């Protein structure tokens, strides 16, 4: 069982900065803005060759005007405390001891969890003076760190992991045993290298988790959908746009298949974005789309397909990600409104006709289970291995049905096709003058390959490669007769 470490504290004390340092990532959004982190963010860390799970949480504090959101954030933090084996109580050395710190310490004493007091932001300060007040919390030794620079982090984590590291028995080996052990270790390293090299070529998509990004405009029900699938209060859900600010990665096993769900912040028009933090959130969402295998676009049934939904779809298509479209809150609209929404989808999403559309209620769960079949179908299609002979045969059938257009009076020749990559699926076609083929014929070939290969939910890209002329850079060697004829011609021209 991998030990779990939870980072707890007031808002803006540096929990997310510390989380990023421990996980050696930039997964947690960081800014000088209280209440930026709202959901539980999970990450993997390796400390002294031992694996741990780190949980970043929203701050615990009473802020006037946002009590309801704050209540949900506090609940998320308390859930993290219950999950954790060790709690790191992060404090702000510059701000000193505040009433909220006393309340958190009181709660931690009741839970009787292994707790470490960590005073952050001690850079540029006298650590002895800065840490004195925090001993009054009666939770043991206070560790001073600077998470942004890494000062004191190694000493802290060495103390944290001590209970989880088994003591190694002292074994004295003879010289012969030492030599045998050395060569066995060398052989293991060689075998490991060979294995890693072969793994690059033998990696089976079925053995990898499906990374699923859930995207959409603010307040369309993305976090509600994640919570229903997980069957727990995992994501902060509230009827205010922008409740989710960061991209949260959540592992899940469903029907013996591994998934990694990525719950993202809502994306709206750039003109409506006022806060710098929201711009960071949008960038993280777009990066989550690029990192995903499949994207689940959530549309609000009450509002229909907006221009912002179309912009998101365009970005997903350009990124080459597989797609499943979900219309949420379907139970909240009338039958007449449902007809209008379906007509709008047919009219405005005609360019994404390869993606399946589901009508669901994330709140009540209707239609949610059917999503997994379409998600797996889209992933399987985008990672399908297709041999060269089949692709070439399909290309020839497409050519027989509809000949390529003329280019400067000459017919384009399509010679053969092969696979050029997966996720997205790329078909490379070789031939003469292929780079001059117009867009309409490219779309025809793309749709023909899609129908023939039964590709659903995944885009197909067609790339053309011009066949090289083997004689393009070579000069013909003249025969003896041609050489004599050339000399006579030159002599004749000189006499004139």
From Swiss-Prot:
Residues where GTP 1 binds: 9-16, 56-60, 120-123
Name the record gives this protein: GTPase Der
SUPFAM superfamilies registered for this protein in UniProt: P-loop containing nucleoside triphosphate hydrolases (SSF52540)
Pfam families: KH_dom-like, MMR_HSR1
Coiled coil: none
GO MF term list: GTP binding; ribosome binding
Gene3D superfamilies for this protein: 3.30.300.20, P-loop containing nucleotide triphosphate hydrolases
Similarity annotation: Belongs to the TRAFAC class TrmE-Era-EngA-EngB-Septin-like GTPase superfamily. EngA (Der) GTPase family.
Domain KH-like: start-end pairs: 384-468
Annotated InterPro entries: G_ENGA, GTP-bd, GTPase_Der, KH_dom-like, KH_dom-like_a/b, P-loop_NTPase, Small_GTP-bd
Binding-site positions, GTP 2: 216-223, 263-267, 328-331
One GO term of the biological process aspect: ribosome biogenesis
Source domain of life: Bacteria
Keywords linked to the UniProt accession: GTP-binding, Nucleotide-binding, Repeat, Ribosome biogenesis
Gene: der
Functional summary from the UniProt entry: GTPase that plays an essential role in the late steps of ribosome biogenesis.
